Amino acid sequence: MFVGEICVRRPFPWTHLLGYLAHRLIPQVEQVDDGMYVRRIGADRVGVTFDAASARLQVEVSGHVKPTAVLARIGRLLDVEHDASVVDRRLRRSPLLRPRVARAPGLRPVGAWSPFELGVRTIVGQQVSVAAARTLMHRLVQRCGVLTPECVVAANLHEIGMPGRRVEAIRSFARALLDGHIDFDRPWLEVDAVLKQMPGFGPWTRAYLAIRLGRDPDAFPDSDVGLMRAAHVATPTELRVLAEPWRPYRAFAATYLWAIDL
């Protein structure tokens, strides 16, 4: 077993970041247990905890995965270099956001372990509850074994509980990655331009991915029902107007509004 550490910038609201992950877990792949984020990679296991006294993430890696690659992925997933001072100072000006920032200073968008995995999870979650999306992801894992483009293309996804168009969108996404049509190492604007031409990647989906994959600090899915509910507005237009003073950090504002435990 390998045990490593990752230094993080304070403030680092581990409990709230863990809550975000717990609410969106992929069954059989991830779990949150007693303050630890656990991820399985085939037969291997990664566990992450946070030591508040030293401001370090403690990472346990068992199996044959490369520890350096795991540490890099965790660092990106949790954006450990995020400097909260400027962002939180701006968002505290909002009466709506001020109490949320006070309760979880340093909250930032959670990234992704795998761009493909998050893309699939986002398509699956369209127009369904978080609980329903979790159930569908469980079925996908059961059918595919491992959520990679190769396994998704080869899997039988018939009668999995999703509309046929959504299943085809997932398959098209997998094929585009295998063909090299999508390259997540390219600048996000280039990636977004490709996604825009593909089925299943409308404005909401692309804005959400811009937050979590593109690290666009001002991306904002203004049609999101959860954001409208948290902001106490009824329409996307009202939400856009309300969010205007939050620029250029609307993605962080969205993250505070999405947090279910604030």
Whereabouts are the PLM-identified features?
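HhH-family (HhH-GPD) DNA N-glycosylase catalytic core used in base-excision repair
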Residues: 1-262
